């Protein structure tokens, strides 16, 4: 989206605030329904980030798949659960929480130190040199496929990792 600088910055700050407040709501709200709605806000803000980055297809996929399907499924599942189960054995801090926070903090620190040292410019040029010329493609689905593995490789991989985590979480919940 080609916007003037101040408007783009304002929208970026507005989306960041929505993302931060929504993610804090997911973590800290005691009612699972409110947490699910906060998750919907987070996923909606992520799709708006993709629109600001001129990646409209990924934004539409994010909106349809995550907000429209996954979040509605989570809300549907939470509504069928017994609400009193959540408050029976409520501890503020457990050993598992400490281990999880240490693992997440170490992963965050390693990503923060690794990402600035990565040569993203070289990665972009290697994908551009292997790119198929779009005018030779027959259908739009082939063009979308080429864009997903070249121009939108990083968002595509992040979405696939999020789907994998959701699948593993669903399996873990189903086994209990």
From Swiss-Prot:
**An annotated Gene Ontology molecular function:** quinone binding
Asked if the keyword Nucleotide-binding belongs to this entry, the reply reads no
Q: Which reaction does it catalyse?
A: a plastoquinone + NADH + (n+1) H(+)(in) = a plastoquinol + NAD(+) + n H(+)(out); a plastoquinone + NADPH + (n+1) H(+)(in) = a plastoquinol + NADP(+) + n H(+)(out)
Name the InterPro entries on file: NAD(P)H-Q_Oxidoreduct_6, NADH_UbQ/plastoQ_OxRdtase_su6, Nuo/plastoQ_OxRdtase_6_NuoJ
- This entry's Enzyme Commission designation comes to 7.1.1.-
- Keyword Membrane annotated: yes
Q: What is the predominant subcellular site recorded for this chain?
A: plastid
Localization = Plastid, Chloroplast thylakoid membrane
- UniProt keyword terms in alphabetical order: Chloroplast, Membrane, NAD, NADP, Plastid, Plastoquinone, Quinone, Thylakoid, Translocase, Transmembrane, Transmembrane helix, Transport
Transmembrane intervals: 10-30, 33-53, 61-81, 92-112, 153-173
Role of this protein? NDH shuttles electrons from NAD(P)H:plastoquinone, via FMN and iron-sulfur (Fe-S) centers, to quinones in the photosynthetic chain and possibly in a chloroplast respiratory chain. The immediate electron acceptor for the enzyme in this species is believed to be plastoquinone. Couples the redox reaction to proton translocation, and thus conserves the redox energy in a proton gradient.
The record's note on quaternary structure and interaction partners says: NDH is composed of at least 16 different subunits, 5 of which are encoded in the nucleus.
Name of the protein in its database record: NAD(P)H-quinone oxidoreductase subunit 6, chloroplastic
């Amino acid at each position: 989206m080609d916007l003037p600088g101040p408007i783009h910055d304002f929208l970026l700050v507005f989306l960041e605030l929505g993302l931060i407040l929504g993610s804090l709501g997911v973590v800290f709200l005691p009612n699972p329904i409110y947490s699910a709605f906060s998750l919907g806000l987070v996923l909606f803000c992520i799709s708006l980030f993709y629109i600001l980055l001129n990646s409209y297809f990924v934004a539409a996929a994010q909106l349809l798949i995550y907000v429209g399907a996954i979040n509605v499924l989570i809300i549907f599942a939470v509504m069928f659960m017994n609400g009193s189960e959540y408050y029976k054995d409520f501890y503020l801090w457990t050993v598992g929480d400490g281990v999880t926070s240490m693992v997440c903090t170490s992963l965050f620190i390693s990503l923060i130190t690794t990402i600035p040292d990565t040569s993203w410019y070289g990665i972009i040029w290697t994908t551009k040199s292997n790119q198929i010329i779009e005018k030779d493609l027959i259908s739009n689905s082939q063009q979308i496929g080429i864009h997903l593995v070249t121009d939108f490789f990083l968002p595509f991989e992040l979405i696939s990792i999020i789907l994998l985590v959701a699948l593993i979480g669903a399996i873990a919940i189903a086994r209990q």
